[in-house]
From Swiss-Prot:
Top EC class of this enzyme: oxidoreductase
Entry's Gene Ontology molecular function annotations: 4 iron, 4 sulfur cluster binding; electron transfer activity; metal ion binding; oxidoreductase activity
GO biological process: photosynthesis; photosynthetic electron transport in photosystem I
Protein's name in the database: Photosystem I iron-sulfur center
Source species: Chlamydomonas reinhardtii
EC number(s) on file: 1.97.1.12
Reactions accelerated catalytically: reduced [plastocyanin] + hnu + oxidized [2Fe-2S]-[ferredoxin] = oxidized [plastocyanin] + reduced [2Fe-2S]-[ferredoxin]
Protein encoded by which gene: psaC
Cofactor note: Binds 2 [4Fe-4S] clusters. Cluster 2 is most probably the spectroscopically characterized electron acceptor FA and cluster 1 is most probably FB.
PANTHER family: PHOTOSYSTEM I IRON-SULFUR CENTER, PHOTOSYSTEM I IRON-SULFUR CENTER-RELATED
Cofactors demanded by this protein: [4Fe-4S] cluster
Residues reported in the UniProt entry to bind [4Fe-4S] cluster 1: C11, C14, C17, C58
Role played: Apoprotein for the two 4Fe-4S centers FA and FB of photosystem I (PSI); essential for photochemical activity. FB is the terminal electron acceptor of PSI, donating electrons to ferredoxin. The C-terminus interacts with PsaA/B/D and helps assemble the protein into the PSI complex. Required for binding of PsaD and PsaE to PSI. PSI is a plastocyanin/cytochrome c6-ferredoxin oxidoreductase, converting photonic excitation into a charge separation, which transfers an electron from the donor P700 chlorophyll pair to the spectroscopically characterized acceptors A0, A1, FX, FA and FB in turn.
Any GO CC annotation of this UniProt entry: photosystem I
Outcome reported for the amino acid change (mutating V49I): Leads to partial destabilization of PSI. Unable to grow photoautotrophically
Length: 81
């Protein structure tokens, strides 16, 4: 079952989530929205196994990276009927 990895604009560009991911699902991309001038991106979500290490590593009060597992993804993204 596919997982959705969502990066929110509260990302501070610290790279903690990228370093925590054992499967290199995440990478940093240029972004002018924070002091670090970069933010996390999830170009390889098909490789995500749902371990949520990226969430655990995120230091922001509102998790900037969220992993929605399987059926949770449609409910969390507001797609359930």
């Amino acid at each position: 079952m596919a997982h959705i990895v969502k990066i929110y604009d509260t990302c501070i560009g610290c790279t903690q989530c990228v370093r925590a991911c054992p499967l290199d699902v995440l990478e940093m991309v240029p972004w002018d929205g924070c002091k670090a001038s970069q933010m996390a991106s999830a170009p390889r979500t098909e490789d995500c196994v749902g371990c949520k290490r990226c969430e655990t590593a995120c230091p922001t009060d509102f998790l900037s990276v969220r992993v929605y597992l399987g059926s949770e993804s449609t409910r969390s993204m507001g797609l359930s009927y």
